[in-house]
Each structure stands twice: as C-alpha cells, then as structure tokens.
Amino acid sequence: MTDIAQFSTGTTWPEIATDILAIEDRHTSGAYPKRPMAIVRGEGSRVRDADGRTYLDMTSGQGVALLGHSHPRIVEAIQRQAERLITCPEIFYNDQRARLLERLAEHTPEGLTRYFLCNSGAEAVEGAMKLARMVTGRKQILAAQRGFHGRTLGALSATWNPRYRDPFLPLLPGVMHISYEDIGAAERAISASTAAVILEVIQGEGGVHPASLEFLTAVRDLCSKRGALLILDEVQTGLGRTGAWFACDAMGIQPDVLCLGKGIAGGLPMGVVCWSESLGRMKEGSHGSTLGGNPLACAAALATLDVLEEEDLPNRSHALGERLLKEFGGANHPLVREIRGRGLMIGIDLRQRVTPALKGLMTRGVLALPAGPTVLRLLPPLIVQQSELDHVRQAIFEVLEEINDGRDID
C-alpha cells in the first residue's frame, strides 16, 4: 500500500489523526458510536489509519466493499464515467442504466426483471413496501423479530430492535412482527389483509441467524395461497456474500420482491428493488429517487458484476466460508457458544459481551463488527486471501484466550 497523503501540510501522523477526530467530534451528528481511529486509505482487504497503522478489514465497510477497497476495476469505471456524465435522473434514458438493468436481469432470481434503482438498502426496503401496498391494495406488512431492514421511518417499522424503534414511535401503522422460524406464527398472521411478508434469508444485525429451508418454504407457500407478496431483503446477503449470487437461490426460494444494496456498486451508494414481471409497473409518479440510477453508480455496478462473474467470487466465497466455518467449529473454545453463517458472512456467538473481543482484535490489526450484544460478525471482502483469513482466525483465538484468562487486552 502506498503512503497516504498528509491531512494538513507540515503535521506528523499523530497530529493528523488528532485533527480528524477533533473536527468530526466538533461537528458530527452524534448518531454513530465511533471507534477512536481515522481511516484514510484502503486497498483490497486492508485499510490504513491516519497514524499509519494497517488493519485487515473484516467489516468490508459494513458489507459495502464487496470487492475490497479501491478495486482497480471499480476505480477505472468511476474515473471513465465521471469524465462523461455523472448524473442523469430517470426522467431521461441513459446508456449506463440500460446496460445495468440488462445485466441485473441475467442474475436476479427467475422472473424478477423489473427494477427500481435508488441509493441504499433502506431505500430499497421503502420502495418494496410501497410496491407491495400498491400492487395488492392491502395495508399489513409482516416482518420478523430480530430482523433489521434499515432506519428510515418505513424500513424502521419493519426493523425489530426496540432500541432503534422506541424513540420514533408511533411508526408506520399496519406493520407486525412474528417469531423468526415459527411456522405456526406465520400461518396465524398471514391473512387476506397482508400485503407482504419481509424477511432476511440470514438475519445479519440480529445475530447472523440463517432461516431454515422449512420455514422459508412454509412462508412462501402461505404467501402464495393468501395473496401476499414475499419480500426478501438481501441487502447484506446478496451478490455472492453467502456463497451464491443470492442466498434465496441457494435455497430454491422464489421471492416476489428482492431488495439489494450495500456492495452492488463497489462502494458507491446504490440500492435496487427487484420484482416479478407479473406484478407490472409502478404507477407513474408513485415513487422517485433523484439520484437513483445515476450513471456514475451504474458504471461502478457494472464493473462490480464483471468482477463477480469473471473471478467466480460467489463460488469462491462458498469455498472460503466452508473452510473457515469448519476451522472455527472444530476449535471448541469455551467462550464460543455457537458458530453460524454461510459463505463469507459468519457470526461467532460468544458466552459474554462482544465488545472486549472487538477491542482486542483492533489491537491486533483486525476490524470486525458486532451483531447484537454477544455476536462477533465477520464480513470480509470477497477478494480476501486465505492467508488473511488464517491471520484473522488466529487473532480471534488469541483474543479469546486472553479474555478467558482474565488478561487486560486494551
């Protein structure tokens, strides 16, 4: 990795970091709990902070850096498109958008060939919920306990965590939550009033909990019988993350609507609502997104799809994940309650709070995420090397040993 340009002329690395942290703290919204580091450069699976320290990024920027940081194909596509045309709203046609829509139709689950392009996963969920109400004429939306679908008001209504919801009550009326994996609860709840059921195939924020084939099949059948739509939120699990192009494909579950986001544009903001041709078009003027489908993001998304295809990254994710899950599972560590996940989406459920482990990993040059109070979540870029995963695995075991021995890891 090449040297990072200095933040301000004539200052040393520590002063640069202090400048960045102080400025952000002085002006930030306060919405985010921040780690005491300033990331200023990224390349592949690694990022560098303003003090010159390098870290293996097992967060992928919260799942966004699907191809790693500053992938050369993404950088080239952005530079080339930025010289031609950056923005073009959907009231006009555009070549990059047309190419992307055509390419999406080659990969999204069979029959899902209508798309609304937006800027985030939460926006995609909002669009999916509006589409469901519009198409069915019904109001009720069913979501799952422990589920996470975003923090905008509609998406937040489908999100379960009371910590996120309670300050903003009342939320969208007509949204109810059922127990994840409870077929009986689904059968009782899905009715002639239900517009849609929205689920994650693997709950991410809720602790990396995969749904069983039995549960998803039952919900799919109930939706079909009772005229409700099945919306699958694959914002985090889609595009190779779980070892298949889409997690629902690997399980043979056909959604009516699919939500995408995070890494689809290689790091630029993009979300997509995908739905079945049988549902028809949205009514003109019923929805919109000023920046959605802009040529710059579309060019980056096209480059992302190219790399996913050419390097067969979904299958690579499957192979790397299988090995990593096996290695973690075979360790039988006393602090580990359970290992869950698929592909390169892995949750290590600890018998204690996860925060000390996250801090310990940072001191060893590894960045990871929580998924609830006790789960250590790994979302490495799909281009991660086996040697890097080996290093991460070793660092995790070292940190857990220190915690188990009662040693100070700060």
Where are these regions (language model features)?
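Conserved N-terminal phosphate-binding loop of PLP-dependent enzymes in the Aspartate aminotransferase
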Residues: 2-410
